[in-house]
């Protein structure tokens, strides 16, 4: 059985055992003999230079924040005012949009394929107009696709579809009597 060394009290400076005293002494002497990390020795006499232990000063880059957008190298112009941007959108929706109907296989062909519609109308209006031109009954289905890629929602704006998916300034609407795409 080994005896556990007594626990020193917080206020006592006397080491608990002679072995720990020699350890502390050895550690302190080793630390004193080693130069500090980052300290530079004077090349003339081998002693540490007091200037070498000073922290590295921060550099002032001279940048003044915030940088104005007119002085920015990246931006070539200022963004539009919100009211002006909204007015531009309303002006686009006030005009007319050209819609070209393209029949898919098994769909009847229209005599005239190009029509104009107000940009503020919903895509539902385009589908109703197409059903009327094809003389569809209430039970007949008409499937419409923009650019033969996707079927837009009936509540989509025709002007928005035209702005995003126009081809040669026309909105290409493919139609079929049966589902053509997945």
Curated annotation (Swiss-Prot):
One of the Pfam families matching this protein, by short name: APG12
GO biological process entries: autophagosome assembly; autophagosome maturation; autophagy of mitochondrion; glycophagy; piecemeal microautophagy of the nucleus; protein transport
Biased composition range(s): Polar residues: 23-34
Cross-link Glycyl lysine isopeptide (Gly-Lys) (interchain with K-186 in ATG5), where in sequence: 182
Signal peptide as annotated in the record: none
InterPro entries reported in the protein's UniProt record: Atg12, Ubiquitin-like_domsf
A molecular function (GO) term: Atg8-family ligase activity
Domain of life: Eukaryota
Coiled-coil blocks: none
GO cellular component, one term: Atg12-Atg5-Atg16 complex
Claim: Transport is one of the keywords in the record: yes
Principal localisation: membrane
Record localization: Preautophagosomal structure membrane
Keywords: Autophagy, Isopeptide bond, Membrane, Protein transport, Transport, Ubl conjugation pathway
Disordered as annotated region, ranges: 1-63
Biased composition (Low complexity): 10-22
Gene3D superfamilies in the cross-refs: Phosphatidylinositol 3-kinase Catalytic Subunit, Chain A, domain 1
Membrane topology annotation: Peripheral membrane protein
Complex formation: Forms a conjugate with ATG5.
Family: Belongs to the ATG12 family.
Functional summary from the UniProt entry: Ubiquitin-like protein involved in cytoplasm to vacuole transport (Cvt), autophagy vesicles formation, mitophagy, and nucleophagy. Conjugation with ATG5 through a ubiquitin-like conjugating system involving also ATG7 as an E1-like activating enzyme and ATG10 as an E2-like conjugating enzyme, is essential for its function. The ATG12-ATG5 conjugate functions as an E3-like enzyme which is required for lipidation of ATG8 and ATG8 association to the vesicle membranes.
Protein name: Ubiquitin-like protein ATG12
Organism, as annotated: Coccidioides immitis (strain RS)
Gene name per UniProt: ATG12
